[in-house]
Amino acid sequence: FGVDTLLPASVRRGSAPQSGAVPENPMALLGEYQQFTRDFMEREDLPEVDAAMAMRAAGAPEMGKGGPQLFSREFFEAQMEVVIEEKVPVYAAGLGNPGPWMDRLHSNGTKVMAVIGKVKHAQQVVDSGIDMIVAQGHDGGGHNSPIGTFSLIPQVVDAVGDRVPVIGAGGISDGRGVAAAMILGAVGAWVGTAFLATEEAGIERFQKEAITESGDADTIVSRSMTGKPARMIRNKWADAWVAAGKEPLPMPYQSMISGPVMASGIKAQRKDIMPGFAGQGIGLIHSIRPAAEVMRDLVDGAERALADARFYS
């Protein structure tokens, strides 16, 4: 695909010409963009899906009428109440600072982690009382940082590593990546895509196959799914936004547009439509395996890599 800084203007926030800028009220474009979705689904011969299926594909649980809007403040607050009620042992915040919830989480004995992509965000969550930080670089799948993994980890370690443990993340798919994160100062590694391609992972089989069939240049960063930049396996839906020169709506509105396509792509088992999110370490993953086997290889590979590195000492 090339270097991410060469993304077309239509998929970079703030880079669209004034005539194509998103208005202050994104709902003003909702009708036009929903028609774009319908046209895309017809062109790709995708099956129709009901609203509930579309919401689930966009990441929302089933909710009755009058429930909170997807990805709204009320939506997240309702989810947090469940986390607290169930007294989960570990909670990881993927977007934002969990500071306002820290006292209630800690009173339950919950260990709280935050995934961050910049040094300033690391400093903010540490000041709020976080237990661990995951420094995830641009190589990572899903929502990620504009800063590369190898550059981000040591800077975060230098900034806050004396106050909380820092875990490295972003494109780490084997033991060598784990070792590299630790050499950069992290206490360990946060691995995502490698575990998506396991028998136990809760994604569709065809999406696991898409991971094992992809190579190093097969991921892109696009706002076409959620409205925030996210790394995913290249697909026709993301390409359609570039071709049309359209600027995706900000979160949470873009999920209203992409939800039907995501659900229909899953229903039709279309690797070219909904292959899913994945990091740049995807080219190291060649088969669907049991999670325990992946874990053993990560540990063994890290130990070998760290042992090999010692010949310089």
Give the location of each predicted region.
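Active-site entrance/lid segments in N-terminal catalytic domains of soluble metabolic enzymes
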Residues: 1-162
